[in-house]
UniProtKB/Swiss-Prot annotation:
Similarity field: Belongs to the WD repeat PRL1/PRL2 family.
Record's subunit section: Associated with the spliceosome.
Sequence intervals crossing the membrane: none
Protein name: Pre-mRNA-splicing factor PRP46
Mapped WD repeat ranges: 120-160, 163-202, 205-244, 247-288, 290-329, 331-369, 380-419
Keywords tagged on the record: Cytoplasm, mRNA processing, mRNA splicing, Nucleus, Repeat, Spliceosome, WD repeat
Localization annotation: Cytoplasm; Nucleus
Species this protein is from: Kluyveromyces lactis (strain ATCC 8585 / CBS 2359 / DSM 70799 / NBRC 1267 / NRRL Y-1140 / WM37) (Yeast)
Function: Involved in pre-mRNA splicing and required for cell cycle progression at G2/M.
A GO cellular component entry from the record: cytoplasm
Superkingdom of origin organism: Eukaryota
Lineage: Eukaryota, Fungi, Dikarya, Ascomycota, Saccharomycotina
Length: 434
């Protein structure tokens, strides 16, 4: 019995060394993990833990080959193997997380500067929207109850549309029809024929002021919302209300439509963002990460994601599940009224105090912060950014402001990373991409 027991020990050691050698030879030159191993890693890593234990056992084996193998596994090319077979309780430390976050290098973006100031409205400029087809003109709505259409290149007024009797809060232009829709505090949503420059339809149904409107990109419907805290869907042709989506507890500030689920996204003063399932007629997801009034949200023009802003808080979200992507470096930015994103991953957040904050969308890094230019004769209290949008190319930024002006901003053409390094990249553990 004793002889048999002693004879089995060398066999077990040999098996252990053989298994270890196989694993090291398999992965010592690997730069990534096979999908099957990654799944094991995500499912408690039972097989991999066994291997990790074998590595530890081999350290105690008093023979030449096993000692050489242990030394071999400390080579740089094999560090991936040891990292894979960590025990589940070996979590990354806060300092390691911080250093990892700092190691990300944000994309460099050229700085922005004021290019043009346009005057014409006699009240706050509450909304702005660019022609999505030809990118040749843009429309603005104001507290003076009018909608004005401007030439984008020259900044000249083309026409003034009159029809609302109270402040115009939002504008949406259809890509599929020659129509523009406007939402107003007078409880009406109007459809404007851009070929005849007249209002051709009114949509009645909201119980109080309408704050936002958007056109569905593939269906003949529009979504509206406002002070009555419900989202309403309308048939464009018949003007009939086809669905009401209740759920928010406070006035809704912005609604956006998508061609795929979730087809409706809304944000509200109740500090929530809701993703709506219009087939079921209810919210499929409620995002509660913000703590204050969410004043605006916008879709990324190329990615399937969106961003939202509230006081001292800018966040981006992945669609369709609504997963939090990034906390932006937005501390001490104050009340934020508007957010816009271009194709180059530049995010603008416009503040109630007239601050324009420019961020790298991928990392949340604030690379430029500047104050808007005061218009002669305006009060300091009127220096607020109320709305914004990039043009179709993303090279021009248009802002509507509390001093009744419209401003067009462009990037500095000859800027380089050496001449404008931007604000320092000093992320915190709060500001990171998840």
């Amino acid at each position: 019995m004793n002889t048999s027991s002693r004879s089995s020990e060398p066999s077990k050691v040999a098996d252990d060394v053989y298994v270890q050698t196989r694993w090291n030879n398999e992965f010592k030159h690997a730069d990534y993990l096979p999908e099957s191993l990654q799944k094991c890693l995500d499912q408690e890593k039972t097989v991999l833990e066994r291997y990790s234990e074998l590595v530890e056992v081999s350290k105690t084996v008093a023979n030449e080959s096993s000692q050489a193998l242990v030394k071999h596994t400390t080579k740089p090319g094999d560090q991936l193997v040891r990292r894979v077979f960590q025990q589940p309780h070996q979590q990354i430390s806060l300092m390691e997380r911080y250093e990892k976050t700092r190691s990300y290098k944000p994309q460099w973006h050229a700085p922005w500067k004021l290019s043009k100031v346009i005057n014409g409205h006699t009240g706050w400029v509450r909304c702005v929207c660019v022609d999505p087809v030809d990118n040749e003109w843009f429309a603005t709505g104001s507290n003076d109850t009018t909608i004005k259409i401007w030439d984008l290149a020259a900044g000249k007024l083309k026409i003034t549309l009159i029809g609302h009797v109270m402040s115009v809060r939002d504008i949406a232009i259809s890509k599929r029809h020659p129509y523009m829709f406007s939402a107003s505090e007078d409880k009406l949503v109007k459809c404007w024929d851009l070929e005849r420059n007249t209002a051709i339809r009114d949509f009645h149904g909201h119980l109080s002021g309408v704050h936002t409107v958007d056109v569905h990109p593939s269906l003949d419907i529009i979504a509206t919302a406002g002070r009555d805290a419900v989202v309403r869907l309308w048939d464009i042709r018949s003007r009939s209300e086809i669905m009401v989506l209740p759920g928010h507890k406070s006035p809704i500030n912005k609604v956006k439509c998508l061609p795929v689920d979730p087809q409706i996204i809304s944000c509200s003063g109740d500090a929530t963002v809701r993703l709506w399932d219009i087939i079921a007629g209810k919210a499929s997801k409620v995002l509660t990460h913000h703590s204050r009034n969410i004043r605006d949200l916008t879709l990324h023009p190329a990615e399937f994601s969106f961003a939202s802003v509230s006081t001292n808080d800018v966040r981006s979200w992945k669609l369709p599940e609504g997963q939090l992507l990034t906390n932006f470096q937005s501390q001490n930015t104050g009340i934020l009224n508007t957010v816009s994103i271009n194709h180059d991953n530049v995010l603008l957040a416009g503040g109630d105090d007239g601050t324009l904050c420019f961020y790298d969308y991928k990392t949340g890094h604030k690379y430029q912060s500047m104050m808007t230019t005061e218009v002669a004769g305006s009060l300091e209290s009127e220096r607020s950014i109320l709305c914004s949008t990039f043009d179709v190319t993303g090279t021009r930024l248009i802002t509507g402001e509390g001093d009744k002006s419209i401003k067009i901003w462009k990037q500095v053409p000859d800027a380089t990373e050496d001449t404008f390094p931007g604000l320092p990249w000093n992320p915190t553990l709060i500001s990171q991409r998840f």
